[in-house]
């Protein structure tokens, strides 16, 4: 039975009804993660990558209080420049829906909406996590608890390097979230392939990840999994190089009194300037890379045959081969993606 608060793009609804692979995509990257026009261009490019790897893309957002699973082109264009759009996590989602507001969905909110829609795989850039200075602020992203409670696989390039990565991994372990390095023994750090920390698990094919998900469900453990997919080597910013720039940006945020949800957008904006635009180009590359793997995982989960590249071979930068081991402003209306 359709959920009364969800509106599906026709293509997404048809795919779900047919049991075809679908990949959820967040909308915060459009409203808060990238400048215009790269934000909208990237959203379209990521959707194209999902299609090329055999799945249907479903960008998630809240428009005038309705949860949209898949966005028509005119709404995507509008989101790219809209100003009255909230950044929604678990705590904000019911308010935005009840009040008829507009909102873009973070990792946590996208997971919730994807699960309600029957979508099991979600591609994003990087998750939130434990913020630096947490002993003073208690600033921990809701993404982490959502991974522990909502059964969706999140494919990302690790946690954002602006965070306290050791504590983020510790928190995920405590909450029982499997963290899988895809074809790597190292936990990636968004712009960099190696955070300096080991990946808790390693799997080398989408089919192996799908088997992990099925087994977790069979054991009735609840919650999702995190798939950490390193940025392609040609696109990365080495960890040592980005670390100094992050330290500068963090110091600037503290000096300016930036806190809460405003921290991540501020730091990303500062890093865009400090890297001369490289952080944005790397971000775009890693999101596409994650979208390819997410689509392959969705295909593997459905047991469907993709008409695109063989599973495991389509992700940019991936090395093919066998596994080595296991009253807001009015939004435009429209139907269709």
From Swiss-Prot:
The record's catalysed reaction(s) read: D-ribose 5-phosphate + uracil = psi-UMP + H2O
Q: InterPro entries from the xrefs? A: Indigdn_synthA-like, PsuG
**One Pfam family from the UniProt entry?**
Indigoidine_A
Region feature Disordered, mapped onto this chain: 306-337
Compositional bias segments (type: Low complexity): 306-325
Residues the record lists as binding Mn(2+): 139
Report the top EC class in one word: lyase
Query: Which Gene Ontology BP terms does the record give?
Result: nucleobase catabolic process
**Record text on subunit structure and interactions:** Homotrimer.
In Swiss-Prot or TrEMBL terms, this protein is called Pseudouridine-5'-phosphate glycosidase
Q: Which cofactor does it need?
A: Mn(2+)
State how the cofactor is bound.
Binds 1 Mn(2+) ion per subunit.
Purpose of the protein: Catalyzes the reversible cleavage of pseudouridine 5'-phosphate (PsiMP) to ribose 5-phosphate and uracil. Functions biologically in the cleavage direction, as part of a pseudouridine degradation pathway.
The EC number(s) this enzyme carries: 4.2.1.70
This protein's UniProt keywords: Glycosidase, Hydrolase, Lyase, Manganese, Metal-binding
Q: To which protein family does this belong?
A: Belongs to the pseudouridine-5'-phosphate glycosidase family.
Residues the record lists as binding substrate? 87, 107, 141-143
Q: Which gene encodes it?
A: psuG
Q: Which GO terms describe its molecular function?
A: hydrolase activity, acting on glycosyl bonds; metal ion binding; pseudouridylate synthase activity
**Any one cellular-component term (Gene Ontology):** cytoplasm
Q: Active site located where?
A: 26 (proton donor), 160 (nucleophile)
